[in-house]
């Protein structure tokens, strides 16, 4: 049975604002949060929107990435985030938590009901293969139907994992990413996301070949913000980099304390009082 949801004016305005960010010239950086605290930190830092990271949410719940987090857990986390920040929130929807496009639509409806205004929908499977592009197109079309039903212009960010999964030669990856990106845009996606480590020339080729706003991910090969903006990249995601950085620091801290060294923790200037003041609205 289809759940009936009510979209209020505030959520509708957030959706419109988030869509405009993709339609306006110039690149914006969107950080990926894994809980309400990280989303709140990003908002206070001045970011105009935040997205979730499936990897980060999985790590925060004690799991590896790769479709380990249930839809119920995702709904819980997203509701906590949207209840704490005022900026638009986009959700890493993985493959939509279903293969049936109509079930993907209903799953998206449930996430919209807790305040989401955007979705990353990917074609990469946990076994390292790409889903058939025809199936991905049907899922995108189902989300477009939901937009019309709710009169809510939420952002569909269609992700293709040709580079992320390192499928084929360099030329084959580029051709497949461009082919899928254009097919997804034609199906109704508002933006095309091609994550993966890539150089400047690959980024330029993707901007040129994909006839839709392009989203790339921060990576160690080429991460010149000004250079990416000049190429025409519209959206730059931090991905799971920040949460992995914090996990690494926490692991080091745990090892130090286990070995009798608490200097790093005790020397922190982020006192109890400062922490409470920071998170006080």
Language-model regions, residue ranges each:
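Extended, intrinsically disordered, low-complexity segments
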Residues: 2-11, 18, 241-281
């Amino acid at each position: 049975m289809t759940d009936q949801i009510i979209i209020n004016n505030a959520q509708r305005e957030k959706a419109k604002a988030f869509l405009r960010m993709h339609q306006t010239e110039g690149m914006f950086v969107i950080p990926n949060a894994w809980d309400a605290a990280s989303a709140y930190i990003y908002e206070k830092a001045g970011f105009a929107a935040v997205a979730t990271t499936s990897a980060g949410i999985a790590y925060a719940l004690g799991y590896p990435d790769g479709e380990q987090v249930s839809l119920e857990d995702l709904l819980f986390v997203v509701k906590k985030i949207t209840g704490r920040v005022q900026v638009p929130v986009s959700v890493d929807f993985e493959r939509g938590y279903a293969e049936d496009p109509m079930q993907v639509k209903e799953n998206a409806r449930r996430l919209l009901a807790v305040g989401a205004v955007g979705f990353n929908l990917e074609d990469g499977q946990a076994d390292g293969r790409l889903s058939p592009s025809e199936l991905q197109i049907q899922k995108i079309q189902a989300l477009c139907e939901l937009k019309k039903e709710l009169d809510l212009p939420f952002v569909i960010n269609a992700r293709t994992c040709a580079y992320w999964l390192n499928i084929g030669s360099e030329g084959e990856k580029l051709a497949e990413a461009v082919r899928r990106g254009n097919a997804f845009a034609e199906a109704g996606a508002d933006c095309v996301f091609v994550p993966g480590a890539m150089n400047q020339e690959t980024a330029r080729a993707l901007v040129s070949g994909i006839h839709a706003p392009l989203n790339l991910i921060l990576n160690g090969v080429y991460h010149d913000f000004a250079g990416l903006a000049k190429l025409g990249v519209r959206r730059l995601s931090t991905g799971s980099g920040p949460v992995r950085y914090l996990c690494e620091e926490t692991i080091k801290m745990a090892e130090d304390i286990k070995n009798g060294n608490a200097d790093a923790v005790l020397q922190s200037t982020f006192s109890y009082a400062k922490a409470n003041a920071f998170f006080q609205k």
